[in-house]
Amino acid sequence: MAVKIRLKRLGKIRAPYYRIVVADSRAKRDGRVIEEIGKYHPTEEPSFIEVQSERAQYWLSVGAQPTEQVEALLKLTGDWGRFKGDKDAVSTVRTREAKPAYVADEKKKPVLKPKTEKAAPEAAAPEAEATEEQA
């Protein structure tokens, strides 16, 4: 069985995102897969690329052939270099900057009240079970 590492297309028209999958080469593009090993969202800025490195290394070592696009993604993440023997291969994937945490304005009064836990009914429940067992 010839195994390929390729992209499985998901999403809407003109808004694609992909899963990096291991599948039989004869299977349909979006058909049955052996394993999902990553994600690729090309429409985000910068593109979101996530690959489970251990699983990619395993499948490459047992002979799975990556498609051209997946090979390019593996080169960006450094997995292709590690597979070819470069121990110093590093990921060159750019990541999005973290959003600053939201800080509520202390001058304004909060609209929503925080929930309070009702501890009293929960404490009464074990006592009720104990009285039923004695009866």
From Swiss-Prot:
Its GO biological process terms?
translation
**A Gene Ontology term for the protein's cellular component:** cytoplasm
Q: Which GO terms describe its molecular function?
A: structural constituent of ribosome
InterPro entries in the record:
Ribosomal_bS16, Ribosomal_bS16_CS, Ribosomal_bS16_dom_sf
Q: Which keywords, in A-to-Z order, does the entry hold?
A: Ribonucleoprotein, Ribosomal protein
Domain of life the protein comes from: Bacteria
Q: Where is this region: Disordered?
A: 105-135
Q: Where is the composition biased (Basic and acidic residues)?
A: 105-120
The record's comment on protein family reads:
Belongs to the bacterial ribosomal protein bS16 family.
Under HAMAP family, the record lists: Ribosomal_bS16
Please give the name of this protein.
Small ribosomal subunit protein bS16
What species is this protein from?
Clavibacter sepedonicus (Clavibacter michiganensis subsp. sepedonicus)
Q: Corresponding gene?
A: rpsP
